[in-house]
């Protein structure tokens, strides 16, 4: 991805995070990251969700930290290039929400 990535400012956080908090994303204690656990009907839907997210993450060159247990997928987002939350995380989280909603 072209251009320097910057960590979100306090003002940017106040503007961008409330919408994600409203749908269940939360900030991690002791780390500048956001996370959420998603629940699906079964493993097949969870894996399909992960596949769709992975394809978008590859396009964005921004990859989540995640793990899957049967019908659950836990995702953590943070930008290593700036050592914390960036607009990349917000954009990927928004995309993830769209995919999750389409599979509900």
Swiss-Prot record:
Modified residues (N-acetylalanine): 2
Domain of life assignment: Eukaryota
UniProtKB keywords: Acetylation, Activator, Cytoplasm, Lyase, Nucleus, Tetrahydrobiopterin biosynthesis, Transcription, Transcription regulation
Biological-process GO terms, alphabetical: tetrahydrobiopterin biosynthetic process
Pfam annotation, one family: Pterin_4a
InterPro entries xref list: PCD_sf (IPR036428), Pterin_deHydtase (IPR001533)
Catalytic activity: (4aS,6R)-4a-hydroxy-L-erythro-5,6,7,8-tetrahydrobiopterin = (6R)-L-erythro-6,7-dihydrobiopterin + H2O
GO cellular component, one term: nucleus
Positions bound to substrate: 61-63, 78-81
Subcellular location: Cytoplasm; Nucleus
GO molecular function: 4-alpha-hydroxytetrahydrobiopterin dehydratase activity
Stored CDD domains: PCD_DCoH_subfamily_b
Enzyme Commission numbers on file: 4.2.1.96
Gene3D superfamilies: Transcriptional coactivator/pterin dehydratase (3.30.1360.20)
Entries under PANTHER family matching the protein: PTERIN-4-ALPHA-CARBINOLAMINE DEHYDRATASE
Subunit structure, as described in the record: Homotetramer and homodimer.
Family recorded in the similarity comment: Belongs to the pterin-4-alpha-carbinolamine dehydratase family.
Function: Involved in tetrahydrobiopterin biosynthesis. Seems to both prevent the formation of 7-pterins and accelerate the formation of quinonoid-BH2. Coactivator for HNF1A-dependent transcription. Regulates the dimerization of homeodomain protein HNF1A and enhances its transcriptional activity. Also acts as a coactivator for HNF1B-dependent transcription.
Name the UniProt record assigns to this protein: Pterin-4-alpha-carbinolamine dehydratase
């Amino acid at each position: 991805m072209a251009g320097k990535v910057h960590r979100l400012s306090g003002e940017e956080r106040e503007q961008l995070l409330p919408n994600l908090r409203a749908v269940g994303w939360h900030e991690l204690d002791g780390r500048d990251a956001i996370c959420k656990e998603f629940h699906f009907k079964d493993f097949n839907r969870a894996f399909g969700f992960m596949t769709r997210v992975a394809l978008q993450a590859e396009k964005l060159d921004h990859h989540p930290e995640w793990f899957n247990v049967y019908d659950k997928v836990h995702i953590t987002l943070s930008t290593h290039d700036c050592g914390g939350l960036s607009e990349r995380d917000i954009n990927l989280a928004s995309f993830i929400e769209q995919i999750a909603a389409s599979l509900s």
